Structures are given as C-alpha cells and as structure tokens.
Amino acid sequence: MESKEELAANNLNGENAQQENEGGEQAPTQNEEESRHLGGGEGQKPGGNIRRGRVRRLVPNFRWAIPNRHIEHNEARDDVERFVGQMMEIKRKTREQQMRHYMRFQTPEPDNHYDFCLIP
C-alpha cells in the first residue's frame, strides 16, 4: 500500500505529463506550487490540513473577568450619577476652552483704555 503522500505525488505527476502533452506552458508552474503545498512539510501528518467534519475548538473561559460580588442597585445608581457628573464637567471644561479664544475679543474695553491707547 502506498501512503497518501505518494498517491498525491503520483496523481500530480500524471496531471503534469498530461498537460505537457497538451502543450500548456502556464499550467505546470501552478501544479509545481500545488505539489509543494500538498506534499506536506516535515513533521506534518499525511493529507495536509484538509479535515472532514467539524473541527473542535476550545471555548474561551471569561469567568475570571466577571465579578462574583453581589451588585446593589443603589451602587449602580451612584455609579451612573458619578459618570453623568463627570461627563457634564468634561463638556463644561471643553466649552470653556473653546470659548476662551472667542471671548478674548469680546471683552469690553477698560475705563482707562483711552488714557493709554496710542492710536488717536
């Protein structure tokens, strides 16, 4: 009995000979690439990575991220209030920063402005 690798190599060699008889120039280079992929490298099981049926995959366990303490609704409400307060403060600060440049030109002149103004 021949192994699967030898059978695959024989099939590819037969296809190469058949295409050479037909005069295909491009096809042999493609089959050489395929034979490289199908031939399998060292340490691989025969048959390559082609599997039939379902593949078992490990399901990640995220239980370590879930806190196991009892959450009180009052605490959640306090967290929401604190978060909303922080957002309002951030909005206020950004508004002040944006208006600072605008308000610099809108300030009224001081009373003694004309005493020190060099422009007549």
UniProtKB/Swiss-Prot annotation:
Annotated region (Interaction with alpha-tubulin), positions in chain: 31-120
InterPro entries per UniProt: BEX (IPR007623), TF_A-like/BEX (IPR021156)
Molecular-function GO term, any one: alpha-tubulin binding
Region (Disordered): 1-54
Tissue: Very high expression in heart, skeletal muscle, liver, and kidney. The levels of expression are uniform throughout the brain.
Record's keyword annotation contains 4Fe-4S: no
Residue ranges of the region described as Interaction with SIRT2: 31-90
Role, per record: May play a role in microtubule deacetylation by negatively regulating the SIRT2 deacetylase activity toward alpha-tubulin and thereby participate in the control of cell cycle progression and genomic stability. In absence of reductive stress, acts as a pseudosubstrate for the CRL2(FEM1B) complex: associates with FEM1B via zinc, thereby preventing association between FEM1B and its substrates.
The keyword Hydrolase is assigned to this record: no
Organism classification: Eukaryota, Metazoa, Chordata, Craniata, Vertebrata
Post-translational modification: Ubiquitinated and degraded by the proteasome.
Protein's name in the database: Protein BEX4
Biased composition (Low complexity): 8-27
